[in-house]
């Protein structure tokens, strides 16, 4: 779902679409990030027909500025890529998406969660009876940031692969 398609959500639902992915961080020019007011608008529309919003959760402002700062500092090592996309930017975006989903009663999926702390916001919302779901990816459970120096660009993804302690906490959430 991009800003230009928000007015067509009902039409897309009638054609069989029941879930819509949004980027609340920068993705690329073809899939611009959805500003908060547009995310709220999309959630309001989707909640009316019982659909789901799936969110790529990273704070666009933090990520774009931190990435720029890291480049200016000369940080180029793959193992330090996560510093330009800090875990707190993912956690904040998750908390914001959860808040909006509570306001509008929209089912929410947090896509490819990499920050273990982000799970807490979703668990609390579920305890309160909200339909908030999460998924992670195998690479977040198998690799930690220092392995990126071996793998190089093959391991570059967003949200990024994080330090080892995060991997261990993410596994704790998966197993419990």
Where are these predicted regions, by residue range?
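Histidine/acidic residue-rich metal-binding segments in metalloenzymes
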Residues: 4-176
């Amino acid at each position: 779902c991009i800003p230009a398609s928000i007015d067509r959500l009902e039409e897309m639902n009638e054609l069989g679409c029941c879930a819509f992915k949004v980027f609340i961080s920068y993705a690329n020019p073809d899939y611009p990030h959805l500003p908060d007011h547009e995310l709220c608008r999309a959630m309001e529309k989707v909640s009316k027909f019982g659909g789901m919003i799936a969110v790529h959760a990273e704070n666009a402002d933090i990520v774009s500025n931190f990435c720029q700062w890291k480049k200016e500092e000369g940080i180029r090592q793959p193992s330090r890529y996560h510093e330009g996309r800090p875990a707190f930017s993912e956690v904040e975006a998750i908390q914001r998406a959860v808040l909006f989903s509570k306001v509008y009663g929209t089912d929410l999926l947090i896509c490819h969660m990499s920050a273990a702390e982000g799970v807490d916001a979703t668990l609390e919302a579920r305890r309160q009876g909200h339909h908030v779901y999460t998924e992670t990816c195998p690479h977040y459970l198998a690799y930690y940031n220092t392995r990126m120096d071996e793998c190089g660009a093959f391991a570059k993804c967003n949200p990024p692969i994080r330090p080892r302690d995060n991997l261990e906490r993410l596994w704790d959430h998966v197993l419990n």
